[in-house]
């Protein structure tokens, strides 16, 4: 995976969050060369113009996309581009706690203020939404709250789960995982309930299997019947 910054960022001090960072020609060359090497490509892009340049270049995914407009979503539909939104409820408090510079807090507030509206429009337009983490911005694992955010924004619960399983596998080009099928990696999680009815249970993982090996089992030692009643499993 080759990732580029098509627009400014939230945590950088000197640029505008939505300003384009690369020309169309530069993005065309970047994507062409990456794809020639068999690499997937992703673009950090908050602003619409920078994102549209990346989409026209054939980028595989747009990350964040806080200020995407209707033209951007139409281009994504035509090009088959994935959208990886990163609605992070923790970010504003994290920045305040860290005593971040005022301009960074201002940029974060602008992006955060548009993120949910953009996500709702993306869902309404049937965008190809994949699940991302924006790793290290919020503590690892807290991103599980995105399942509930996706559903509150209009996505069906099973579609939200697929965004983190089969959709992510397709985006990243890893066909040996993402669905529960013979011959694929046994990557499983279990939750205490039915996430198709209550997506919030996705934040209550108690069992994790990676490649057929159990790496977490909070119910180890509990009778077999007790471990299965009222629980659901999902494949990664």
Put a short name on every predicted segment.
Residues 46, 88, 136:
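Catalytic metal-binding/acid-base residues of hydrolase active sites
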Residues 82, 86, 90-109:
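Active-site loop ensemble at the mouth of alpha/beta enzyme cores that anchors a bound cofactor
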Residues 5, 65, 133, 192, ...:
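Conserved residues at the C-terminal ends of beta-strands
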Residues 70-77, 93-96, 200, 218-220:
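Short, charged, surface-exposed secondary-structure boundary motifs
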Residues 65-70, 87-91, 213-214:
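Short, acidic/turn-prone active-site loops that include or flank metal/cofactor-
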Residues 1-83, 110-129, 178:
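Histidine/acidic residue-rich metal-binding segments in metalloenzymes
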Residues 164, 182-226:
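C-terminal cap of metal-dependent C-N hydrolases
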Residues 36, 40, 100-103, 111-195:
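His/Asp/Glu-enriched, well-ordered alpha-helical/loop segment
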């Amino acid at each position: 995976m080759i990732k580029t910054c098509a627009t400014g960022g939230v945590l950088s001090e000197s640029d505008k969050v939505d300003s384009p960072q690369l020309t169309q020609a530069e993005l065309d060359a970047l994507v062409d060369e990456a794809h020639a090497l068999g690499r997937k490509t992703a673009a950090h892009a908050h602003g619409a113009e920078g994102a549209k340049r990346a989409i026209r270049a054939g980028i595989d995914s747009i990350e964040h996309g806080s200020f995407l407009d209707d033209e951007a979503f139409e281009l994504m539909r035509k090009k088959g581009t994935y959208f990886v939104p990163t609605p992070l409820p923790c970010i504003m408090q994290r920045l305040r706690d860290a005593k971040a510079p005022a301009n960074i807090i201002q940029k974060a507030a602008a992006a955060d203020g548009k993120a949910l509206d953009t996500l709702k429009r993306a869902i309404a337009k049937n965008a190809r939404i994949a699940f991302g983490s924006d790793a290290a911005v919020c503590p690892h694992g807290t991103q599980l709250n995105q399942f509930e955010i996706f559903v509150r924004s209009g996505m069906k619960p099973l579609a939200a789960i697929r965004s983190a399983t089969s959709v992510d596998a397709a985006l990243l080009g890893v066909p040996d995982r993402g669905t529960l099928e013979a011959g694929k990696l046994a990557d499983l999680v279990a939750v205490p309930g039915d996430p198709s009815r209550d997506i919030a249970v996705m934040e209550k993982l108690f069992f994790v299997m990676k490649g057929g090996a159990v790496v977490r089992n909070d119910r180890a030692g509990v009778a077999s019947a007790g471990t299965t009643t009222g629980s659901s499993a999902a494949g990664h």
